[in-house]
């Protein structure tokens, strides 16, 4: 209502905010003729939600910003032009965009070596916008700022045109039977089911596989989806080793004040009795 009444022209929302906005029962009672630009970011957005959002706001240009507070805060932009129909649209919409003019972005391995196009490593950035350090936290500063680069903690890769693709938070990656499973990919598959409102995929201890893929799912109102049906749905969209081995349904998922999923809250009960948070 405030966006309509105040004639908001630009806004920045995290995906959870967009989802709750367009799914609100009274959303269609309002119009936003002056809303020229909607930027989104701070958390991954699945393809289904992005398509629904662009349909819900047909006269609005969309753009994605990628970065972190330590980078003041944006280092990559997926421009409005990248959201327009074209031969590369589907691929580009999976990316976080290309680096802004004052930032240099690269993909590095754990030893700080730059990786070739298409290979997954850690997203790092440098430039005049990088922080000097964390206040009175020299150890954390030394860990984040190494060899002149700010280490984001995000795993990703870069294509030949310089578009950066975020695959997961490095700490959220699941290693099951020696295979790397990126939780975002599983969440995107789950999001394709019409009964799902929101999901979080985490790794939980497993005696056989080390870790197994576990999905925590929030359903839409009046939905009756069960575990077996959702697992079979995932089997259509992703490889067998990425499919959730267990599904837990909840009425709400833990979110930060900024609307980000707090996966550490979901993981804690499963790992509390373990000596290490990897298995």
Locations of regions flagged by a protein language model:
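Gly/Ser/Thr-rich phosphate-binding loop
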Residues: 5-13, 22-91, 104, 111-114
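Active-site glycine-centered loops adjacent to acidic/histidine catalytic or metal-binding residues
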Residues: 42, 67, 97, 154, ...
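AMP-binding/adenylate-forming catalytic core of the ANL superfamily
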Residues: 3-4, 11-14, 24, 122, ...
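Adenylate-forming AMP-binding core of the ANL superfamily, especially NRPS adenylation
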Residues: 44, 84-136, 144, 161
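Beta-strand->loop->alpha-helix junctions that form or flank phosphate-binding loops
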Residues: 63-70, 97, 202-204, 248
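Active-site and channel-lining beta-strand-loop segments
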Residues: 104-110, 251-258
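Acidic/polar alpha-helix N-cap and adjacent early helical turns
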Residues: 268-279
């Amino acid at each position: 209502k405030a966006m309509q009444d105040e004639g908001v022209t630009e806004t920045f929302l995290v995906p959870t905010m967009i989802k709750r906005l367009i799914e609100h029962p009274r959303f269609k009672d309002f119009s936003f003729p002056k809303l020229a630009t909607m930027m989104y970011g701070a958390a991954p957005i699945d393809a289904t939600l992005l398509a629904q959002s662009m349909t819900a706001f047909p006269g609005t240009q969309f753009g994605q910003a990628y970065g972190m507070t330590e980078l003041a805060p944006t280092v990559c932009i997926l421009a409005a032009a990248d959201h327009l129909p074209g031969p590369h649209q589907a691929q580009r919409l999976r990316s976080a965009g290309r680096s802004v003019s004052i930032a240099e972005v690269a993909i590095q391995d754990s030893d700080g070596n730059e990786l070739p196009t298409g290979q997954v490593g850690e997203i790092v950035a440098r430039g005049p916008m990088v922080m000097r350090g964390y206040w009175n936290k020299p150890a954390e500063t030394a860990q984040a700022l190494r060899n002149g680069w700010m280490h984001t903690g995000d795993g990703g890769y870069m294509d030949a045109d310089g578009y950066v693709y975020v695959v997961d938070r490095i700490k959220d990656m699941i290693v099951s039977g020696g295979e790397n499973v990126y939780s975002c990919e599983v969440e995107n598959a789950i999001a394709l089911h019409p009964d799902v409102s929101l999901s979080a995929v985490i790794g939980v201890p497993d005696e056989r596989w080390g870790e197994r893929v576990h999905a925590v799912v929030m359903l839409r109102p009046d939905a009756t989806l069960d575990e077996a049906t959702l697992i079979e749905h995932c089997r259509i969209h992703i490889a067998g080793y990425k499919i959730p081995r267990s599904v837990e349904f909840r009425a709400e998922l833990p979110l930060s004040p900024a609307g980000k999923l707090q996966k550490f809250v979901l993981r804690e009960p499963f790992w509390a009795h373990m000596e290490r948070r990897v298995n």
